[in-house]
From Swiss-Prot:
This is Cell shape-determining protein MreC. Residues 314-344 have a biased composition (Low complexity). Keywords: Cell inner membrane, Cell membrane, Cell shape, Coiled coil, Membrane, Transmembrane, Transmembrane helix. Belongs to the MreC family. The chain crosses the membrane at residues 13-35. It comes from Escherichia coli (strain K12). PANTHER family: CELL SHAPE-DETERMINING PROTEIN MREC. Residues 1-12 are cytoplasmic.
Length: 367
């Protein structure tokens, strides 16, 4: 009986033929690139199916990321706010550090004598006593601080140490009612005592004669008398001059230059009291004060005319005008000009009349 379907090649032959065809196609594609264009067409035709099959996955990822990113954004926002706050606080501290650096530079730049030593200290507290004006500093006996030690700032005299502990000390301010300080007027070298009147008021110069030559704006410096404070440091500037007609006295007030209500950094001085037995002359104090004022408080310095003549140089001032006498032709008037400074100073120490309007007219009589 003849079968309906004829038998074809065996499976093994088919497999061998398929393998040979596949190898031929692979070799032809690798050598000649015959099917590269066909693959490109096939990838282009199949690519929409890739997007369609990947769309659900991208949708689910987007939804989950949206839900999770809100909390993450809130955390990041909170962290950024905290970081911004810290940066702003650091900027504020940077400004404060710059101010402190400038103050310390001014403080360390205060001119001193060669035999004077200094140490920077900081005010850590103020004494809450309505009857005493004191501050507490962060230096004590371990740092060599002693009672009576002078204390200054970058603008002038502050006070003196009155109590010393191991790590801290108390400083009595010059504005305290129990404090008195020997001073000298820079313009004419008059020496007086400046007494404290409370830090809310100015220093007071009491019981001065009515004709005392002290004016508003005069700079008062330490005279060095008593050996406690160094010579030539600025203390105050005269703020008011009032005449007491009943007692023929002049009441003078002077505003401290150190800014006693805004103290932060101070200088402790050593060696200022070594020459207490031999204080400087008024002329030397005048010279030292001018040198220190040029660095410490140039904005308060009066004009050179208001300071008066330079006292250490009277001899050179007299010798210089003599060559000009032949040009003027008047030898009698030449020596009169150099004697004017001495005449201006002599009435200040002489006993003047009681009337405040007559001293200028009697100045020649004081000669």
């Amino acid at each position: 009986m003849k079968p309906i379907f004829s038998r074809g090649p065996s499976l093994q032959i088919r497999l061998i033929l398929a393998v040979l065809v596949a190898l031929g196609i692979i070799i032809a594609d690798s050598r000649l690139g015959t099917f590269s264009q066909i693959r490109t067409y096939m990838d282009t035709a199949v690519s929409p199916f890739y997007f369609v099959s990947n769309a659900p996955r991208e949708l689910l990822d987007g939804v989950s990321q949206t839900l999770a990113s809100r909390d993450q954004l809130e955390l990041e926002n909170r962290a950024l706010r905290q970081e911004l706050l810290l940066k702003n606080s650091e900027l504020l501290m940077l400004g404060q550090y710059k101010q402190e650096n400038a103050r310390l530079r001014e403080l360390l730049g205060s001119p001193l004598r060669q035999d004077e030593q200094k140490m920077v200290t900081q005010v850590i507290s103020t004494v809450n006593d309505p009857y005493s004006d004191q501050v507490v500093i962060d230096k004590g006996s371990v740092n060599g601080v002693y009672e009576g030690q002078p204390v200054i700032s970058d603008k002038g005299v502050v006070g003196q140490v009155v109590a010393v502990a191991k790590l801290t000390s108390r400083v009595l301010l010059i504005c305290d009612a129990t404090h008195a300080l020997p001073i000298q007027v820079l313009r004419n070298d008059i020496r007086v005592i400046a007494a404290g009147n409370g830090c809310t008021d100015d220093l007071q110069l009491e019981h001065l004669p009515a004709n005392t030559d002290i004016r508003v704006g005069d700079v008062l410096v330490t005279s060095g008398l008593g050996g406690r404070f160094p010579e030539g440091y600025p203390v105050a500037v005269v703020s008011s001059v009032k005449l007491d007609t009943q007692r023929a006295y002049t009441v003078i007030q002077a505003r401290p230059t150190a800014g006693l209500q805004r103290l932060r950094y101070l200088l402790l001085l050593w060696g200022a009291d070594r020459n207490g037995a031999n204080p400087m002359t008024p002329e030397e104090v005048h010279r030292v004060a001018n040198e220190r004022l040029m660095q410490m408080m140039p904005q308060v310095l009066p004009s050179p005319d208001a300071m008066g003549p330079k006292l250490p140089e009277p001899a050179t001032g007299i010798a210089q005008p003599t060559p000009q006498q032949p040009a003027t032709g008047n030898a009698a008037t030449a020596p009169a000009a150099p004697t004017q400074p001495a005449a201006n100073r002599s009435p200040q120490r002489a006993t003047p009349p009681q009337s405040g309007a007559q001293p200028p007219a009697r100045a020649p009589g004081g000669q």
